[in-house]
Amino acid sequence: LIYEIMQLVGYKPSAEEAKMIIVSMMVDTTSFKSSKTIMEEVEVAKKLAYEYELDYDYLIKYCLCLTPIDKMTVEEIITNGQKYYDYYGYKVSSAYLQLYEKPSDSIVNDVWIKALREKIKECHLEMYVFIIFEMEKDKTYEIRVTENGVKKFEYPKILSRGKDIMPVVEKVFAN
């Protein structure tokens, strides 16, 4: 949008401004891997990178915004990007990780899901939706944890929490 306004008024961005325009588009769409990517923005980013001699491949990697789980506690991991929802009187929470590679199933199951089960009790939640975006393979793992069990879903692309995942979760509570 900012770039479009600059074009409309005839303003030519500096190299630093062009870089910031590209970064803002990439960060918002997980380096154009997200389902909410607008293909015209990809073309604009490539054009600007070429025009201003910016390293497009470096920017793609930089803008993945990977979660530094090696420096985080389990509590920080399971609450990263946490949001709360009220779906028809049911309390639901979600959190996510953006990782280059998904950790082993033993870490996910024995450490993270175990901690999520405790978090459900502690916060009196109906459900905790834990999302892992695996950037290396362009996959999304959705883990729905309730007091009654765990349901896991795997998707062959990077989904949007707000656009793709949570609206489906909301429908679970609408019925």
Task: Identify the function of each model-found stretch.
Residues 42-175:
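C-terminal accessory domains and tails appended to enzymatic cores
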